[in-house]
Amino acid sequence: MFKKFVKLILPPIATKTLSFLVNFRKNKYLSHPNTLFDGDDSLFKEEIKKVDVYGEYGCGKSTKWVLNNTLANVIVVDTSKEWVNAVKIDNQSNNDRLLIHYSNVGDLGNWGRPISYQKIDSFSDYTDFIWRQKRSPKLVLVDGRFRVCCFLTSLKFAEEGTMILFDDYINRPHYHFVEKYVSRFKECGRQCMFVVPSKTEIDMIELDRDIISFRNVMD
């Protein structure tokens, strides 16, 4: 009955967002609110409290945790419009510290992955958004789409000493390409942390080539 009433008073887009939010709050990734990354979260929780600006590729449970447990300003990009709207609604009390951007990379399949290259020219909007803001993150979580490109882009634009935490890194060898530029700093379960070195230690021309090469690699 409630759903029928909602459909009568809200436009289709708002109704869709509300329905998505209901499912969002039931999602297993929002259960156990103090546990992140299936428990591999001690490194993240230790380092996030040291920074005043946090960047995130892909939004959700970690976004909410940071807003509720730190004073950091949060800059986030995601490929799902419904997911972005749900996160906004779910974090209304902290929206003054949340800058969240929906990057339209086309129709999506599972986990926000584009199902085609129809909007290939928009892929850079996703990888670059965080670094187009006035303030740069001091900690970046790579946990969404285009992960290698996001990492390399962060390496290019981040200040020396910035921490980059790469989720699902340890057991996915295809991500290990990034060690061409920087060595592992710390590990925590499935995650690996890197620290951005001085730009003088990076071949920036080669880095730009690799960013272009990985721009269209969605995973």
For every predicted segment, state its role.
Residues 130-134, 138-219:
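C-terminal substrate-binding/active-site "lid" region of AdoMet-derived donor-dependent transferases
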Residues 38-110:
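SAM cofactor-binding core of SAM-dependent methyltransferases
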Residues 101-153:
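Internal catalytic-core helix/loop-beta-alpha segment
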